Amino acid sequence: MSTPAMLQLGLFLVVLIALAWPLGAYMTRVMQGENIGPARWCAPLERGFYRLAGIKQEEEMGWRGYAVALILFNVLGVAAVYALQRLQGMLPFNPQAMAAVSPDSSFNTAISFVTNTNWQGYGGETTMSYLTQMLGLTVQNFVSAATGAAVVIALIRGFARHSSAKIGNFWVDVTRMTLYVLLPLAVVFALVFTQQGAIQNLSAYQDVHTVETVKYQQPKQDAKGNPVLGKDGKPVMEDKTSQTQTLPMGPVASQEAIKMLGTNGGGFFNANSAHPFENPTPLANFLQDIAIFLIPAALCFLFGRMVGDRRQGWAILAAMTIMFATAVVVETRAEQAGVPQYSSLGIDQRASQLQSGGNMEGKEARFGIIDTSLFVAVTTSASCGAVNAMHDSLTPIGGLVPMFLMQLGEVVFGGVGSGLYGMLIFAILAVFIAGLMVGRTPEYLGKKIETYEMKMTAITILVTPTLVLALTAIAVSLAAGKAGIANPAAHGFSEILYAFTSAANNNGSAFAGLSANTPFYNIMTGLAMFFGRFFMIVPILAIAGSLAAKKRLAVTGGTLPTHGPLFVTLLIGTVLLVGALNYVPALALGPVVEHLQMLAAR
């Protein structure tokens, strides 16, 4: 790994922690009901929302009531986003006259944005009206992130409270997270992105004259619009030229800010953050990396403060950071090493002052290997899924890294809320394993971990591997699944495995060589996203309710310290072991085989 790459990684981590520490302190006070900062002038608005909805702020819920409210809220969100897409042709703010989205794509997209996945089987600039983007997708970017944060806050209350039947009020948690944390941060980042060059308007698309004439070929058509075929049965191509280009417009910066802060990832444009209107400069690119990790990192500090031991938050953050930094190193080395076959084609892959070198296929020249590799690791460590390069064009090991980061359960920082509650589940598993090894009843943060908690933990951990492996097996077994594969053999399998890994773990990135906008993939990935989200959340809330009802145990000489290097090592080992056991056979059929084939073809 080169010196510039190490310096950028170091700078990224320093800036991240410097911003996350005060944000964590602020979020702690906000979620505990203190009126500070924006809460002072937003408090009347908050109370107005409660009166309008008939919510009593002081009334808390048990875990079942919390879960029911959460699921109802999200199901209504799915219905609203689905309706917007189906009716957008008749609604305003549609200067390009976008037609209604197909039923299967609308179903997929509605679930995708409500579950914080933002998997996209469509191109935003050719499919969605401005109203759908703003009122449907951007709104869900806020509330889906707030939902994840609410769940982890409820789980933390389970650890912090004792002899209590309540874990909080879902409506209050979502409202406060949105009003006081997500909205102010989104305004700041949107203004910065606009200053950097991201667009923000409601104008119709602009036709402009290009600097030079573009020459291209397209299939010749007869009078009825059917392709003309040659004697060999292939379409007859005809030469075309163009001196104009259509530039898409839209309210991009406002959506881009919450897309990153909420670890959502769905792009306004099909190229996502590789598009210069979304991610215009290297500085904007760096700030997008920071935005993705900012709230997940701050939640670690919030965790330490709420349970009364800040060292606990540092331990969780340390485990996440070690795994993330390792992933960045492996990703950067794999992409900088390049592809051996390129050398025989006369392609220079050596780094120099004029080029990044390495595997530049599918990457933006303005970002190069270092910026791209960091972004790849960030977006798949978090459940973001935004991309500034095409992951399908990564080297086999370069593609394995983001896939494996997702397969760990999106716990390496992870999504807003979902990353921390996933890591806390692994922490419970780690102390259970440690307890078995020394013959003691396991406990974590003063709470005894018993049969009920372990049953719920097992369900939580097994949900996503079951979905990923079962749906991948179905897809490679059916003609409808195999029809979407654009690449043969190992890489084609990797495309399907990546798709369901991304969907079930609520990431949203893709190996774009898979043609996924079909009824089969829209329905299958939609189900993976829905069950991958809510079949994890409900058991986690059950754990929160069970822990809150327990009495706090006194620390003794036999209590396992959960704030030191030993526990950090145990936690990392548990996460990696579970990931390896679940997915290594599938990875061996995809990226591992592909890497060996690449080396053999030198």
Curated annotation (Swiss-Prot):
Protein's cellular compartments: Cell inner membrane
Keywords from the named record: Cell inner membrane, Cell membrane, Ion transport, Membrane, Potassium, Potassium transport, Transmembrane, Transmembrane helix, Transport
Membrane topology: Multi-pass membrane protein
Sequence intervals crossing the membrane: 5-25, 65-85, 136-156, 179-199, 283-303, 312-332, 419-439, 458-478, 523-543, 566-586
Renumbered residue ranges of the record's region Disordered: 221-248
Molecular function terms from GO: P-type potassium transmembrane transporter activity; potassium ion binding
GO cellular component, one term: plasma membrane
Listed Pfam families: KdpA (PF03814)
Comp. bias regions, Basic and acidic residues: 231-241
InterPro entries according to UniProt: KdpA
Primary location: membrane
Domain of life per record: Bacteria
Role of this protein: Part of the high-affinity ATP-driven potassium transport (or Kdp) system, which catalyzes the hydrolysis of ATP coupled with the electrogenic transport of potassium into the cytoplasm. This subunit binds the periplasmic potassium ions and delivers the ions to the membrane domain of KdpB through an intramembrane tunnel.
UniProt subunit comment: The system is composed of three essential subunits: KdpA, KdpB and KdpC.
PANTHER family per UniProt: POTASSIUM-TRANSPORTING ATPASE A CHAIN, POTASSIUM-TRANSPORTING ATPASE POTASSIUM-BINDING SUBUNIT
Family statement drawn from the similarity comment of this UniProt entry: Belongs to the KdpA family.
Protein name: Potassium-transporting ATPase potassium-binding subunit
